[in-house]
Amino acid sequence: MDLPPAWRRPDPLRGLDKVPWTELCRGRGVDELLRGAADGDLTACAALEQRLLDDDTVSEASAHAVPFLVELGASYKVPGDVRDRVIFLLAAMALAGAGFTAEGKRTRRRWNSLRRELPRLEPDWITETRYAVEKDAPKVFEALGGAEVACSMALAIAVPEVAPKHVADVAHGIAFAGTFPQMLEEAASVALHLLQGEQSDDVWAYVTAQGHPDVLRAYEAGEYPPNQPPGVTVQLMGYRYAFLAAYGDSAFDHG
């Protein structure tokens, strides 16, 4: 009998020593944290989140860490709670709102009055990190298969353009079954909307915000960046719903 794809994956940290971590911006010690995560150390996971997504900010090390995070998230050799955390981290990194410059300063995503994103100076680690997640996320989706889990919805919300069809089927099943927790249903509804290529306008963003009182309060208070397109806002809301589904209200401020 053939093993599931996630069991057939190679060593998730293969090639880790070939990356010059100490030479990368914010890269010192990332290799050891990845090893700790692979061994099931949740403290190492928390440290990775802080290092690779510091206050919603990615860096050179973030982009280089993505292939290893993907393999951790796709491998059944890694404990399930670590896989979940890593997949959520990948989704959050793809949605990051800021990036570190070569001088260690933060540059944030900004939009003009027409809601077109303004260019950033190189190196643009926001774009590089998102591209890295998009490139390898299909490996995670393949490994998760039809699992009806929040981390799958979070990743689908973050990079819907690379999610295979079966993920939309999973999202549809969760959203309309009427048997799943509310936050997971909310996340699945957002994922399905994005996976079907539906347009998000301000009305849809407001409707999406109804899923949680804190999200609605933040939206009505104008706490999202000026001129941010509603599609981005919907993604951020959907990610929060998925995270709440997995970890509850006590973790609402994550990322």
Which ranges hold each PLM region?
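Long, low-complexity, highly charged intrinsically disordered regions
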Residues: 1-39, 202, 217, 221-233, ...
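Alpha-helical solenoid scaffolds in large eukaryotic transport, assembly, and signaling factors
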Residues: 11-74, 84-99, 121-129
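Extended, charged low-complexity segments
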Residues: 193-255
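Eukaryote-skewed repeat-based solenoidal scaffolds used as protein-protein interaction platforms
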Residues: 74-76, 80, 84-202, 208
